[in-house]
Amino acid sequence: MKKTISSVVVALLVNGAAIAQIASPDESEAIKKTALDYIEGWYAGDAARMERALHPELAKRMISTDPKTGRSQFNHMGAMALVQRTRDGSGKKTSPDRQSKEVTILDRYNNAAVVKIVASDWIDYLEVAKFNGDWKIINVLWELKPKPSE
């Protein structure tokens, strides 16, 4: 009986520690800050802020449909290309009143998290990892929102 109670107590403690890691407000704020550096950096054309958010090996990917053939196509961009597009001001084309940046942490465990950003014309799903003490975006899967019917 003592063994069973001890096992239950240990299981509860381990589970509680895992829940504490998932719910840690400090880590959640750090993850959110990384996501905001990414999206706000994009809108502002702030390449330094964008670069701070990204791991150098980042892969940003999107599956789109070729309008001529109707077939899926794979689009890929690396960290430096994204930083350069930010520096070039591509994000500044979105007017300030349309610069949506709704950030939601979908899941987190230890040093990995998944974050959703609802932006003006697209949705980003970020895979974020703690790397040398800082949260960095490792992967982004994104998709354009459908255009409103006219």
Specify the residue positions occupied by each region the protein language model found.
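Bacterial N-terminal signal peptides
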Residues: S7-G16
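Positively charged n-region of N-terminal signal peptides that target proteins for export
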Residues: M1-T4
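Short beta-strand edge/turn micro-motifs at domain boundaries
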Residues: V114, I123-P148
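Short, low-complexity N-terminal intrinsically disordered segments enriched in polar/charged residues
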Residues: A18-A48, R52, P56
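Ligand-binding grooves and catalytic loops that recognize ribose/phosphate and carbohydrate rings
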Residues: L58, G78-A79, E143-E150
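N-terminal, post-signal-peptide region of Sec/Tat-exported proteins
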Residues: Y43-Q84
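Surface-exposed, charged secondary-structure patches
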Residues: I63, Q73-W122
